[in-house]
A protein has these predicted regions:
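Short, well-ordered beta-strand core segments
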Residues: 69, 93-94, 143-145
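ATP-dependent small-molecule kinase phosphotransfer cores
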Residues: 31-77, 81-88, 112-113, 127
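Walker A/P-loop
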Residues: 14
Length: 164
């Protein structure tokens, strides 16, 4: 069984994933890192040179390679029905959430997020992305955790309690 960490960029999926693997006998997989390694270029370069559709194809392929892993998924992975179905059939999906203003503060200096690159009003853009993805996140998630005012340890422990 896999544990899929889903949610918007900046919710802490990679950080929480690494903490979870210290508590569980699972490997940790950051899908974005695996995609970059496979493609030989950054996510931003993939978006710029090959387009979002090609990135989403790589993402869907990488999702299927792992078992008994904690997988930090890219924020948009839930936009494809095939990915939502695969996660439901092969593990538990944990949705990490935070308000657009909290995410904007966390991501203010980030240049590695192609959907935010060069954008002025990141908070408004994040809110629009959330509204577009919200139902897919909620329908995919087996459990949801609001991360805005919790420590990494509190979030990790809440997930572990839910998995027991």
């Amino acid at each position: 069984m896999n544990i899929y960490l889903i949610g918007m960029m900046g919710t802490g999926k990679s950080t929480i994933g690494e903490l979870l693997t210290k508590e569980l006998e699972y490997s940790f997989v950051d899908l974005d890192e695996k995609i970059e390694k496979c493609a030989g270029k950054s996510i931003t370069e993939i978006f710029e040179n090959d387009g979002e559709e090609n990135f989403r194809n790589l993402e869907s392929e990488q999702l299927r390679f792992y078992s008994n892993s904690v997988i930090a998924c890219g924020g948009g992975i839930i936009m494809r029905e095939e990915n939502r179905t695969f996660m439901k059939e092969n593990g538990k999906a944990i949705l990490l959430t935070a308000s657009p203003s909290k995410l904007s503060k966390r991501l203010i200096q980030s240049d590695s997020r192609p959907l935010l690159s060069g954008k002025k009003n990141k908070e408004k853009l994040l809110k629009n992305i959330w509204l577009k993805r919200r139902l897919h996140y909620l329908n995919t998630a087996d459990y949801t955790i609001e991360t805005g005012h919790k420590t990494h340890e509190e979030i990790t422990n809440e997930i572990l309690r839910h998995l027991d």
